[in-house]
Amino acid sequence: MRGKILIVEDYADWRELLSDLLQREGHHVKAVASLQDARNYMAETKDLDLAILDIRLVETDKTNEDGMRLMAEIRQHRSSTRVIMITGHGTMQTQRRAFREFQAFDFFRKEQFDSEEFRQGVHEAVEQAAQERKAHTENDYMRSHRYEMWQRKQS
């Protein structure tokens, strides 16, 4: 299944590697370097299946921006979008926080990066997001249909 994927990674080499890997799999990929670029893309994009976020982003003002902050925004406003965290700075505590507080779908360390495991994680995340979106669409249709039937009975 092909998905719409956003990659937020400040290191150009990693951004390009991940983007190329996923485009070869047939996914529609947008790769950006900053939280602001990610927010801008999400504001204009519908049905985002997956966001792949670096935990630590060094913004142009040289402050460490936390990818967890963006993950929290995604979880709050885009419940069907899955999030995979990727980091070169992750500890077990960071990983647990990503899963417990923000319901990350998966977590990868750059030092131990396995492209096959990563592709599998992406595939599962995209599939799950699509299934959830389909279920929401079907539920919306059923609610609409029931309301129309109720209106007819009232007439």
Residue ranges and their predicted role:
Residues 6, 30-50, 54, 58-60:
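Acidic, metal-coordinating helix/loop segments flanking the phosphotransfer/catalytic sites
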Residues 10, 86-91, 111-112:
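Conserved active-site segment of CheY-like receiver
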Residues 11-35:
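Two-component/phosphorelay signaling modules centered on CheY-like receiver
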Residues 36, 63-72:
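Short amphipathic helices of CheY-like receiver
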Residues 43-46, 73-81, 101-102:
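Conserved phosphotransfer cores of two-component systems
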Residues 51, 83, 106-108:
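Two-component signal transduction core modules
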Residues 65, 69, 89-108:
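Alpha4 helix (beta4-alpha4-beta5 surface) of REC/receiver domains from two-component response regulators
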Residues 115, 119-155:
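CheY-like receiver
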